Amino acid sequence: MDFEYVTGEEGLKKAIKRLENSPYLYLDTETTGDRIRLVQIGDEENTYVIDLYEIQDIEPLRKLINERGIVGHNLKFDLKYLYRYGIFPSATFDTMIASYLLGYERHSLNHIVSNLLGYSMDKSYQTSDWGASVLSDAQLKYAANDVIVLRELFPKMRDMLNELDAERGEELLKTRTAKIFDLKSPVAIVEMAFVREVAKLEINGFPVDVEELTNKLKAVERETQKRIQEFYIKYRVDPLSPKQLASLLTKKFKLNLPKTPKGNVSTDDKALTSYQDVEPVKLVLEIRKLKKIADKLKELKEHLKNGRVYPEFKQIGAVTGRMSSAHPNIQNIHRDMRGIFKAEEGNTFVISDFSQIELRIAAEYVKDPLMLDAFKKGKDMHRYTASVVLGKKEEEITKEERQLAKAINFGLIYGISAKGLAEYAKLGYGVEISLEEAQVLRERFFKNFKAFKEWHDRVKKELKEKGEVKGHTLLGRRFSANTFNDAVNYPIQGTGADLLKLAVLLFDANLQKKGIDAKLVNLVHDEIVVECEKEKAEEVKEILEKSMKTAGKIILKEVPVEVESVINERWTKD
């Protein structure tokens, strides 16, 4: 194995001289604690293992990496370490992200090498002592090998990505990421560029009003205990005991509750939702809601660091391409709790979300003429749907009828049953309708929005004949589905994920052009939260909205994209 171990400034200068003609470099790091020990870097012919413990002046290395593209595996990890040294590459290609896009089940470097190159890597030195004063030859060889492997993997994975289908996004072929790595797949271009954004999102963290969090947690815990005591005094049953609760509800209140697979009476939320009008059920559901809020507040408190939380984001957290977050999860914060997130002194949040984006994507994906026309005319889709299925003028639609239309739209584009619609309307939107009413509304929806019925029928037919449905989002993200629900969800939600990520990339590029400092602090499916100085907020809002609408024009060719924004020092829309 050919590589050079670099331990001094002269050796570093020589290495950089040989590497500086390459538009992209292969990179990996070995770390210990919060420091980088080794930076392994190479081009098509040369591999260097650079020991940062031995080199004082790393400015030449910083300049080399910052001006180039980097190929690596799980690059978010390396980028967060490099950032501490003032190093951040201008473009990224991540073989782990490529593995997700190509549909592999396992994404470690070893698994990818085994799949594509046909051999196994020796990972026994991964957890060795990288802080040792003298590194062994075996450690150095292990470190160098990761770069050598990346050199073999990159062209194979790039060529496979370039075969992904795409209906949209040809504008992205002109971007820096596309040119540096010779990428032709729009969705791959977006995901590779987005690696940098996820690293920055984790570095930035999300600011919290610590006093508000502490007070809210105490208040919620007090209220929870009060409700539990009230329940016990009234019914002499512990509301947190499934066994005691099941006995109370079935024997005293004669509720016909379903059984679990083990034959026990089920008292989970789903089983109880049909009986919300029964007093003990109502109380139990309130207690559970309070407990969930308390648990979430505790989770946030556990992860506080310098007045912020620093979640881990998984760039592709689902088949759809949607992100997920953990430690803490800040994508499932209840609206009542969002006010505990507060921008730092002198700063504010710019909060922007895509308006009715799932419906807009669905209308374009299935090419429904009625829905397309309504969006082109700038109609409020929920009000419009209510008027269509209820046979009323749009201006006569009540607030409750519009709520019902939300359940109809978001439920029926995905083909839920009449029973499912009645439950969804009650649970999700607080509107009660009978099974018969749900059936009539369902029939009227599909009679008017015919393309959705035709799409659902095609999906069912393909599932019956082939056992699976294969397809891709409008930007070319592949998916394979074995159930009807997945087959209709994946292309819509996947296109939504593509759209959000592209919007963030355009926003970052536009910020850099203007030289404005603003931090991305959270992303939730169709919402972008940015922290910036109060004086810059209006300008940042304008740039963010423009970026989101431009992303919309790239992915959605027929439906206009609308964006709703607020400027607030707390993460609330009020």
UniProtKB/Swiss-Prot annotation:
Q: Which GO terms describe its molecular function?
A: 3'-5' exonuclease activity; DNA binding; DNA-directed DNA polymerase activity
The residue ranges crossing the membrane are none
Q: Which GO terms describe its biological process?
A: DNA repair; DNA-templated DNA replication
Keywords for this entry?
A: DNA damage, DNA repair, DNA replication, DNA-binding, DNA-directed DNA polymerase, Nucleotidyltransferase, Transferase
State the reactions this protein catalyses: DNA(n) + a 2'-deoxyribonucleoside 5'-triphosphate = DNA(n+1) + diphosphate
Q: Which domain of life is it from?
A: Bacteria
**EC number(s) on record?**
2.7.7.7
EC primary class: transferase
Q: Does DNA damage show up as a keyword for this record? A: yes
Concerning CDD domains, the annotation shows: DNA_pol_A_Aquificae_like, RNaseD_exo
InterPro entries the record matches: 3'-5'_exonuclease_dom, DNA-dir_DNA_pol_A_CS, DNA-dir_DNA_pol_A_palm_dom, DNA/RNA_pol_sf, DNA_polymerase_A, RNaseH-like_sf, RNaseH_sf
Q: Say yes or no: keyword Transferase present.
A: yes
Boundaries of each 3'-5' exonuclease domain copy?
A: 4-161
Signal sequence region: none
Pfam families reported in the protein's UniProt record: DNA_pol_A, DNA_pol_A_exo1
The record's similarity note reads: Belongs to the DNA polymerase type-A family.
Q: Which PANTHER family match?
A: DNA POLYMERASE I (PTHR10133), DNA POLYMERASE NU (PTHR10133:SF27)
State the name under which the record lists this protein. Answer: DNA polymerase I
Organism, as annotated:
Aquifex aeolicus (strain VF5)
This chain is encoded by the gene named polA
